[in-house]
Amino acid sequence: MENGCTSHWLLSRIAGSESRLANNRAFRCGSIEKAASYLIGELLIINQAEAKSNKRLPKFVHKADTYHKACARCKARGKTCAYGQGAVEKQTVHKPRGQASSVHMPVPMLVPPISSAPSLETPPESVAASPPTVDSIPVSHHVNEDPEAEPDLEKNRAYYTAHGRFAGQVAAAINERAGLIPATCNQVPLVDAPLFGDLNLPSQSCALSSSTELPPRAYADQLIDIYWQHVDPMEPVLDRQRFLENYEKAYSTPITPLCADYDLWLGILNVVFALAVQRQELNPLHQRNEEANRFFQRAWVLLPAESMLWKPGSLELVQCLMLMNRYLHCTNNQQKTWTTAGLAMRIAQSMCCHLTETPLLKGSSDDKALKQKVWASCVALDRCISWSLGKTSALVLIPSPPPSSPQQLGENAMHDTLGLRLHEIGNQIQLAQIQNRTSLAARFRPPLLSQQDEYHNAALQLDACLQDWENSIPSDWQPRNLRMVTDRSSRAERYLLHLRYLHHRIFLYRPMLARFYAMKPDTQPLHKSPSLSHRLLRESASMCIEAAQQVASLVNETLEPDEPIGLLPWWYRIYYLHIAGANFLAAMFRSELFTDSVSQSWESVMLALRAHEHLSPYVQQCLWTFETLAARITGKPYPSMDGGGCGLMVDGSSGVSFDDIFKDINFDFDNFIFGPEDFGEGLV
């Protein structure tokens, strides 16, 4: 039926209901959705009348009749509703088999846009945000019913987010989880886990009466000493000489402002106090969080939004934002964490901190060195924020370090040079992943080169870059020699540098790990030998697990139970332990990956996390989540929050969904790889 005929047919059928339409308030008020719903109701009434006289209405009326029922079925099966607005539009393009033509109807007039059908690209937030329950998990929520599906769907599946999250069979194994209490801890360290407790930030328009107060000089000296010894070496931001000069003036003349931006400097000082308080691991939990949060709230009030957005930028403003961002990183303020990092990066760029030579700018060599130091910290901060929050980091031009030998560089210059080179490799890794996840890249990809093959080609070159970086490290910087470094600050710097290097390796190999676990175990026929692509995929997954093992080993080396302050900040230790633990959970699905060595590394991660339970309530929740997920895979009794055991879980061979396991720790492998907008990985 043509569009014009359809319109006349509708008018003739509804003409008899003109009086009811005129009296309908929704129709008179111009509500399109309600009016469309009313029209469908009229069509259903006509449908019932026509059925009595054995007359048949056009096919689309029958679809309207079954709209809500079909939506319920599609929702239960986890598929996009075939009767949704977007799906109907697609059906008008593809002709069904066995029909010469299909009826093309004006969809907006027939299907009320009451609710959009679930998108295949992004799962509904309500589903992604809540852990699965026994009754809410379907038996099979990924059944390909499209007879014209792409033949290479399985091949590119792990590299294309449009196909949604990984699907798997849940079958009878889900019924055996009837007594399971779903994990309520979906938070991730340095993402949204409140490691520093609940931080309530006051409105910046409401100044705190104590915002300009300073602690007693003796206690302040103690906190300043802790910061320079145990916080600044990890990520240097401030110039020590300038900071100490202003610090002395603040206590010698506390009433007279030191400079025009006195409030800004007080904000820096209060964040320094807050980080130093959190660094003391032996202090009682509630006392530490309460005191540190009070210092941070003072700094927050002292830095109003107008000073960040509309006033000219300064190095002090960038430094204050970076310090604030470090603290916010360990709270549940994701939006403020992401925003402060972006502001610091943009303001630093506006000041040309990213340029090695700025002949038009006046300033001493010390100012230029400080700008380069701040810019290097900005890049490191942006990388940490973006990879942990699952956002795309800024692909900025990083100045090339001077081509000097290790003997010609000092210790600090060597650390900065290695850091800049590593950040540049990280830029290339992320760029390769972004290029592979865009539709534009797929359009210009050679016909015989799949998304998987293209990323594998890039990964080979990037792996060589990482290997060259590791080979360029002097012998006394190698991991095997780190324990022999006598200077505590230097040893901490080198440990953190190697942890970041291993993080880059995990970030590079994780797409292949995701692809490896998306493949069904029986996809390879028994009578055929594994292909080269399959072997490379398996080897890449093994290298990802090996990097996670090295992360766990390095973190355990830094543990010093007898020291009041650990070698590395305790929030970084929890962060990297969480990364390693998630990869070990993935290894449990494959016997060729979860070897005895990996099992020992898994146990070391659990022991290390138990040693951090006194530092944050989140650690106990993380432990319980890891133990529960491991029990689901291995079939051992899973624990409860009170320490008791629960029923038995089944092993991975019985059809437990891989994504169903990892959604409880907010870990979406598919979104992490190549999401349409963000990476979407909670762990990185």
UniProtKB/Swiss-Prot annotation:
Transcription factor that acts in concert with sorR1 which is a transcriptional activator of the gene cluster that mediates the biosynthesis of sorbicillinoids, a diverse group of yellow secondary metabolites that restrict growth of competing pathogenic fungi but not of bacteria. Disruption phenotype: Has low impact on expression of the sorbicillin biosynthesis gene cluster but, except for very low levels of dihydrosorbicillinol, impairs the production of sorbicillinoids. It comes from the Eukaryota. SMART domains: Fungal_trans. GO terms for biological process: DNA-templated transcription; positive regulation of transcription from RNA polymerase II promoter by galactose. It holds the Pfam family Fungal_trans. It is found in: Nucleus. Keywords: DNA-binding, Nucleus, Transcription, Transcription regulation. The keyword Transcription applies. This is Sorbicillinoid biosynthetic cluster transcription factor 2. GO terms for cellular component: nucleus. GO terms for molecular function: DNA-binding transcription factor activity, RNA polymerase II-specific; RNA polymerase II cis-regulatory region sequence-specific DNA binding; zinc ion binding. Its main location: nucleus. Residues 114-151 are annotated as: Disordered.
